[in-house]
Amino acid sequence: MAIMASRKHLKRFKSPVHWPIHPKEYKWTVKPSPGPHAIENSLPLMIIVRDILKVADNAREARKIINSGEVLVDGRPRKNYKFPVGFMDVVSIPRTGDVYRVLPDERGRLVLHPIDEENAGFKLCKIVNKTTIKGGRTQLNLHDGRNYLSDDEFRVGDVVKLSIPEQEILERIPFEKDSLGLVTGGRHTGEIGKIKKINITRSSMPNTAVIETGAGKTFLTLKDYVFVIGKDESVISLPGGK
């Protein structure tokens, strides 16, 4: 029984550092259920409703709100309070009219950035790999677990703009020199800048990219950490009007 409990629950002091909860307030916290995002890259819906948005005062109220279908993720009601919400997901509460996009800040924490009606109509997803399925068709595998059948013009590292709630591909944002990128990992998490150079090593060493921020700062980061958000300017609104 103890082994099963450890799998179903999560001690607060072992929760990811980006969760906005006090590690010593209580012993246990909600553990995200398996889903589109890994535990280290997500927030349980309960934490969002109770601790971040403060729509509920306690876990019981939060579960009631979530179970009633009042909270939407990417335009669809999610009634599982353990549902993992992650990077680029759009969270909305129609009753209050509030809509947010999940983004990383410069300390590596996931934050809910308020967005307007136009931004609420789409989300961005990165192509993490492609596979060829039966019949020779190409399947795009996205960072949030989605899969799409498409033509072969898309490349790994590109980002697609998806409509919400229809989930249709509206636009391709290519990963290429001079595209605008948001860094999602490493010491430069949350920083935004132009891709000035892409270094393909063709060895066991990881590929890298050189990023230049609007302030003229230049740094090197892993290519996999760069999430393109536009060509000349960002297609999404960003915290602080970046």
Curated annotation (Swiss-Prot):
Q: Which domain of life is it from?
A: Archaea
> The S4 RNA-binding domain covers which part of the protein?
43-106
InterPro entries, per this entry?
Rib_uL2_dom2, Ribosomal_eS4, Ribosomal_eS4_central_region, Ribosomal_eS4_central_sf, Ribosomal_eS4_KOW, Ribosomal_eS4_N, Ribosomal_eS4_N_CS, S4_RNA-bd
- One BP annotation, GO: translation
What keyword terms does UniProt attach to this protein?
Ribonucleoprotein, Ribosomal protein, RNA-binding, rRNA-binding
Pfam families assigned = Ribosomal_S4e (PF00900), RS4NT (PF08071), S4 (PF01479)
Provide one Gene Ontology cellular component.
cytosolic small ribosomal subunit
Q: Which GO terms describe its molecular function?
A: rRNA binding; structural constituent of ribosome
What family does the Swiss-Prot or TrEMBL record give for this protein?
Belongs to the eukaryotic ribosomal protein eS4 family.
Q: Which NCBIfam families match?
A: PRK04313.1
What is the protein name given in its UniProt record? Small ribosomal subunit protein eS4
